[in-house]
C-alpha cells in the first residue's frame, strides 16, 4: 500500500451537539468554550479523524449514561465549526466509548501510516482517554491538546493526564498548531 504524505493525524473526539451545548442530552459543562479552538485545530489538521457517538434507541450504553447521540437526531450531529467539508476529514462513527471499537479505525491508521497523533475533544477522562491510550499502543508519539479538551470530572482528568505522560504521552496547547 502506498504511504500517505501525511505525517500527523489529528483526532477530534466526540465534539457533538449532545455533548458540547447546554441543550445537549449529555452536556459537558463548559464544552462550548473549546469549540473555537477545536475548529482552529481541525482547519489546521493535515488529516483529521472526527469520532462520533452513533447510538441506536436501545443501545446498551444507555444503562450507564442517559440517551445521547442517537443516530439521526440533532444531538448526534457535529457543530458546523468542527466540520471541514474537505476530504482531509474522516468521520468515524462508533457505538462504544473507545474509538478503537470501530472496525474501520485500525485499517485507516495503517493506511495513513502517521508519525504522530494529536488528540482533543470530549470527554477528557472518558473517550479522549480511550483514544489517547489506544494511540499510544501504536508506538508513535501522541499529544493531547489541553486547551481543546473538556472534562466532566477535573480531578479524574488531572489523574488521566499524569497517567498519560507517565506512559509516554505529551501534553501541549493549541498554540503549537496555530498558523504562522
What are these regions (language model features)?
Residues 118-121, 141-154:
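A short glycine-rich beta-strand->turn/loop micro-motif centered on a GG-aromatic cluster
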Residues 131, 156-159:
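A generic "structured core" feature
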Residues 72-125:
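Internal catalytic-core helix/loop-beta-alpha segment
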Amino acid at each position: 500500500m502506498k504511504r500517505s504524505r501525511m505525517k500527523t493525524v489529528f483526532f477530534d473526539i466526540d465534539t457533538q451537539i449532545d455533548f458540547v451545548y447546554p441543550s445537549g442530552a449529555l452536556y459537558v459543562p463548559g464544552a462550548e468554550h473549546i469549540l473555537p479552538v477545536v475548529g482552529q485545530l481541525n482547519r489546521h489538521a493535515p488529516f483529521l479523524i472526527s469520532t462520533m457517538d452513533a447510538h441506536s434507541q436501545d443501545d446498551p450504553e444507555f444503562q450507564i449514561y442517559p440517551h445521547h447521540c442517537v443516530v439521526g437526531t440533532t444531538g448526534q450531529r457535529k457543530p458546523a465549526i468542527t466540520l471541514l467539508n474537505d476530504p482531509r476529514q474522516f468521520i468515524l462513527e462508533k457505538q462504544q466509548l473507545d474509538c478503537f471499537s470501530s472496525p474501520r479505525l485500525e485499517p485507516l491508521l495503517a493506511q495513513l501510516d502517521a508519525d504522530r497523533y494529536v488528540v482533543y475533544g470530549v470527554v477528557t477522562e472518558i473517550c479522549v482517554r480511550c483514544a489517547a491510550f489506544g494511540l499510544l499502543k501504536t508506538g508513535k508519539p501522541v499529544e493531547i491538546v489541553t486547551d481543546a479538551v473538556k472534562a466532566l470530572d477535573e480531578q479524574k482528568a488531572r489523574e488521566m493526564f499524569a497517567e498519560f505522560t507517565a506512559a509516554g504521552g505529551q501534553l501541549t496547547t493549541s498554540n503549537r498548531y496555530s498558523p504562522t
